[in-house]
């Protein structure tokens, strides 16, 4: 009949039988009566324990004919195979959005009801999904129970560990059908695909800025609130987002968890590692629609686009100078504050940027990593090499708007400009 007379008092969800209701209620109490004798993990239902027990068995009889991946149970193979077919059989009755799995649809439906049955006892924040609730609890406890067997790094969730592990394996199973670029995570692929479609469906009600993902919009909204809840215990600097604090703290700890498998160079940010990997592959996937010039990273493309528009949206609050890139604006700001957070371990000299510090280090090592392909002369900085190459090509790209004279380097152009 479809009747569901048994209702959960905690969240209002209804069930056909009292037994199913009792099993569901365990999700609110946290009780897990079915315990695995191999690893001690607990489960709400006996069926879930039975499926879990297969994890300890090395037998994976169900094989994907597309990619060869093996699975413990047939249901997991069926769910996996939908990735290859692109089939999404479960449709949301509210908005028509399609999903591969029934549980993904069930989770999505909560976004329409607004129901958030899971409340954090520490801060009162409410969650629609139990997984998100447990993940949030780790913020208060600091618990990171999932450890990488390769490097020992610990993570709050299993998903974070799995994503991290791909750095070691180099596996990128998600391929863009437009340009054949491959990605380690499905979310990364979806983010990339928006570059092809140009779609940015999430709009900020404060300033009108649009975003590809709801998470990016939520993160952006904190800028308008002005709240900076995350404080560095080393220097007291405040941040709007936790990931910004984490990234900043690596300045103090010198931690560089992202290591290039090609050259061994390590980075503080995953994005920097990805940019470095493209140097090895020669890949430049980001193309300018104006002149077709290609770039290693989206940020380089974005900066280049402003050479066509002349737009300089970042203004210094101290002196009013305008910049086309936020990074350049931040570096310039340090000329007012006097802040120099990057210190040379050899001589103690401090610098405003990491790039400047790295260039300075070459004065101690004598290293000149940038050779000219024409004459073999080597340079400490890529910029110096580029200026030198103009002596071979005869190119003078820096032109004075006052008198029309042109120069091979910005430094010589700036010296000349002072004459006017």
Swiss-Prot record:
Q: What is the lineage of its organism?
A: Eukaryota, Metazoa, Chordata, Craniata, Vertebrata
Predominant location category: nucleus
Similarity annotation: Belongs to the krueppel C2H2-type zinc-finger protein family.
Q: What is this protein called?
A: Gastrula zinc finger protein XlCGF58.1
Q: PANTHER family, alphabetically?
A: GASTRULA ZINC FINGER PROTEIN XLCGF26.1-LIKE-RELATED, ZINC FINGER AND BTB DOMAIN-CONTAINING
- What's a single GO CC term here? nucleoplasm
SMART domains under this entry?
A: ZnF_C2H2
Q: What InterPro entries does the record point to?
A: Znf_C2H2_sf, Znf_C2H2_type
Q: Name one Pfam family in it.
A: zf-C2H2
Reported function: May be involved in transcriptional regulation.
Q: Which GO terms describe its molecular function?
A: DNA-binding transcription factor activity; DNA-binding transcription repressor activity, RNA polymerase II-specific; RNA polymerase II cis-regulatory region sequence-specific DNA binding; zinc ion binding
User: Out of the domains of life, which is the source?
Assistant: Eukaryota
Q: Where is this chain's protein located in or outside the cell?
A: Nucleus
- What UniProt keywords apply to this chain's record, in alphabetical order? DNA-binding, Metal-binding, Nucleus, Repeat, Transcription, Transcription regulation, Zinc, Zinc-finger
Some GO term, biological process aspect, for this entry: which one? Answer: regulation of cytokine production
Span of zinc fingers (C2H2-type): 6-28, 34-56, 62-84, 90-112, 118-140, 146-168, 174-196, 202-224, 230-252, 286-308, 314-336, 342-364, 370-392, 398-420
